[in-house]
Swiss-Prot record:
Residue numbers spanned by region G2: 41-45
SS bond list: none
Region entry G5, spans: 153-155
Keywords: Cell inner membrane, Cell membrane, Cytoplasm, GTP-binding, Membrane, Nucleotide-binding, Ribosome biogenesis, RNA-binding, rRNA-binding
Assigned protein family: Belongs to the TRAFAC class TrmE-Era-EngA-EngB-Septin-like GTPase superfamily. Era GTPase family.
Organism the protein comes from: Geobacter sp. (strain M21)
Name of this protein: GTPase Era
Listed NCBIfam families: era, PRK00089.1, small_GTP
Entry binding sites for GTP: 15-22, 62-66, 124-127
Residues covered by the Era-type G domain: 7-174
Pfam family name, one: MMR_HSR1
Subunit-structure text: Monomer.
UniProt keyword Cell inner membrane present: yes
Region (G1): 15-22
Amino acid sequence: MSEKKFRSGFVSIVGRPNVGKSTLLNRILGEKLMITSDKPQTTRNRIKGIHNVPGGQIVFIDTPGIHRAKSRLNKFMVDEALSSVQGVDLILFLVDGAVDPEKEAGMIKEVLSGVDAPVILVMNKIDLVPKGELLERMSCYGDTYPFKEIIPVSAGTGDGVEQLVQLVHGLLPEGPCYFPDDILTDVPERFIVAEIVREKIFRLTHDEVPYSTAVVVDSFKERENGVVAISATINVERDSQKGIIIGKRGDMLKRIGTQSRQEIERLLDTKVFLELFVRVSGEWSDNSRMLKEFGYE
């Protein structure tokens, strides 16, 4: 009896903003690694999430949502997403199942033009699709592009996610174990900490404020008593945004700090001392030097 081959590879997750890419990956990993919010364009960088299955390893790549870029930051985000479909073994193209497929057809054809890797269309949020319309919508997507498979899932409830993972694993080539099996991601803890703080800003503030913030971890040190001391700066573009982030009598900054600290403590499994500062950094989202300084290269 022949030994089962080990399958592994890189799988890019792409789609419009707010279709549930990060939520899906968190569900697959069984851990909250990717930040999420109900606002579009929460994800800014490509982040790898490593999922080990019996007989294989899947390296998922979470990407920013594909949208019309205005600032240099937006262009960076879109470039991150579009470049991720090259050189991978498989692509998961995520769509909101509740959206009319005809509205997505043009974007799908444009993004996947010239792509060599097989593509699975993942229809997310199927719990929001009216009864009786699911098969019709799947058929419409099938006329748009020669997808390898069309899979309906709900990242929120978990419906269909395990079947998706099994399908992905089966389509990957034979290959090595790229990462140790106890590694969840290839990004450092400092990056994840900055993302957690940014997520709280997205969840607690509104309008242009979350889109105008960049979080930089200035120091990350473990003290002799085991407490991790973290200092981070929240960069904004205008004085008015700084005032909103700080809030009346510092209340908003306190809420951001408390919620961030609690999640960072769960992540690091230790006590955390978190110090947050707010700085006005001008129009940083359109400044090449600052974008590089803040990690958007």
